[in-house]
A protein has these predicted regions:
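Terminal amphipathic alpha-helical/low-complexity segments used for targeting or macromolecular assembly
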Residues: 1-62, 181-200
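Conserved catalytic segment of ABC-fold P-loop ATPases
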Residues: 155-158, 171-173
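Short hydrophobic beta-strand element within catalytic cores of glycosyltransferases
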Residues: 166-167
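Acidic, glycine-centered active-site loop in nucleotide-sugar glycosyltransferases
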Residues: 170-172, 177-180
Length: 200
């Protein structure tokens, strides 16, 4: 595999070497911008918004990210809709594309990983990896500490419970929990009446 072709494989799910010089040069520029974002003061909201427009592939209106925010490519491959909220400590392993729909919330320390490594030790020792795009729908809520693995799609309005590890696609309009994450139930009329346990 020629090093000159490595960058082309970032978005194809093919194996590639992430230590390719072209990839690393671009990555470091992105990480410099991310560093600047994380060093902003809480009062520098306008500066944060300006940096977000430079960092992300796409960023909608009224998005808020609480530093520190971690990202392999500083958000370069992340596509954010409108009204998105990231709590502190969110990590996007954005070696390829991550799409997050309007009005979705990510709790503290959520990890969305697009990158994986071969099971075969002989390939892994050579530092090969592959990437698979992640899609998070509109109006989702991923609780604290949720981990989403490469190639996953989560449907609109779905809630993923804190600490869950999402290893398979999740449909829209469900509550899903656990490791591995499984659908607990559909969102229903009970949820219109009670917002938390017995609270109306």
């Amino acid at each position: 595999m020629k090093m000159s072709n490595m960058k082309e494989k970032l978005h194809t799910t093919e194996l590639y070497l992430p230590n390719d010089e072209t990839i690393m040069t671009e990555q470091l520029k992105c990480l410099d911008r991310l560093y600047d974002f994380n060093m902003t003061r809480p009062t520098e909201l306008d500066k944060r918004q300006k940096l977000m427009k430079e960092m992300f592939a796409e960023v909608g209106e009224n998005c808020y990210i609480e530093p520190p925010f971690h990202s392999n490519f500083g958000g370069k491959h992340c596509h954010l809709g409108n009204n998105i909220y990231f709590n502190f400590g969110v990590t996007l392993v954005d070696d390829t594309h991550v799409y997050i729909g309007d009005s979705t919330m990510l709790g503290p320390n959520v990890v969305i990983a697009t990158a994986g490594h071969p099971i075969l030790p002989e390939l892994r020792v050579k530092a090969y990896q592959y990437n698979a795009t992640v899609h998070i729908g509109k109006n989702c809520w991923l609780g604290a500490g949720v981990i989403v693995l490469p190639g996953i799609t989560i449907g609109d309005n779905t809630v993923v419970g804190a600490g869950s590890v999402v290893t398979k696609d999740l449909p829209p309009n469900v509550i899903a929990v656990g490791n591995p994450c499984r659908v607990l139930r559909e969102i229903n009329e009970h949820d219109r009446e009670y917002y938390f346990k017995d609270k109306k």
